[in-house]
Amino acid sequence: MSVAIIGAGAFGTALAVSLATKGPVTLWGRDTEWADTGENPRLPGVPLPPALRVTDRLDEITAETVLLALPAQVLGGFLAEHGAQFDRRNLVSCAKGIDLATLTGPSALIAAACPQATVAVLTGPSFAADIARGLPTALTLACADAGAAEALQRQLSTATLRLYRTTDVTGAELGGALKNIIAIAAGAAIGAGYGDSARASVVTRGFAEMLRLATALGARPETLPGLSGLGDLVLTCTSEQSRNFRYGLALGSRRPFAAGTTVEGASTARAVTQLAERLGIEMPISNLVAGLAEGRIAMEHALDFLLNRPLKEE
């Protein structure tokens, strides 16, 4: 089966570079003037392989399997405009977030726009630069259809990109979305000078929040401790390669953050506060991140916000 990627950002390009080691790949982006230079400025230092073709024409995306590497808050609009032409294909979401307009994950957006498509999710602990440079990386491929999951696992795995499969789409998708919120909180703890012990507490209690909400929304409990949940959480809470962690650092140290940079965790936190209220679930770290991102809570009050909560069993 042929493969194409929608979204020529760093992650979409990295996946295209990796998959091009197995055969021809088409990468679509709105702005592709850089293609003639042989390198995407969003992924500097990584040459585009000969098997990778870059285009800005959606009618040239004819592959049977299409990876949607678009930000979570952009995906819905793209599907509303173009989804019909991608129905009846294998559509793999690479977004990590919750759509603010519908309070649903990317897979639900795809299923609604393309009801005849086979919908899957690709998620897990990874940085674009690592994938593009051929460094060993393991991800989760989730699809409700076990047979399709196995076929996509074989198709999208490469010599350095190892995919594990699951049929728990909800769990895999929520793990990738929710960990971004906790990464912001972990970054804020470090940026504010609270130290590594505080970060460890944020990560651990944050994972408990992830598990509470995900299982309430139908995820299997055993999915979250895997690559798509705990694995991604550990990576993004400990590395400045993570935009969400860097955003938290900026919040904690009261420094400006690069304008125009996509920070999925900030939008996801806003969505999660609404979901948690609807379900009656306590999500204090997520509420804090939403408050910090929206300016409702000042960083100097963040510690009190968490530590002054009632004492309880772990």
Curated annotation (Swiss-Prot):
The listed locations are: Cytoplasm
Q: Which domain of life is it from?
A: Bacteria
Pathway as given in its UniProt record: Membrane lipid metabolism; glycerophospholipid metabolism
The question of whether Lipid metabolism is a record keyword is answered with yes
Q: Which InterPro entries match?
A: 6-PGluconate_DH-like_C_sf, 6PGD_dom2, G3P_DH_NAD-dep, G3P_DH_NAD-dep_C, G3P_DH_NAD-dep_N, NAD(P)-bd_dom_sf
Keywords attached to this Swiss-Prot or TrEMBL record, sorted alphabetically, are: Cytoplasm, Lipid biosynthesis, Lipid metabolism, NAD, NADP, Nucleotide-binding, Oxidoreductase, Phospholipid biosynthesis, Phospholipid metabolism
Q: Which residues bind sn-glycerol 3-phosphate?
A: 96, 124, 126, 179, 232, 242-244
Reaction equations catalysed: sn-glycerol 3-phosphate + NAD(+) = dihydroxyacetone phosphate + NADH + H(+); sn-glycerol 3-phosphate + NADP(+) = dihydroxyacetone phosphate + NADPH + H(+)
Q: What is this protein called?
A: Glycerol-3-phosphate dehydrogenase [NAD(P)+]
Gene (name only): gpsA
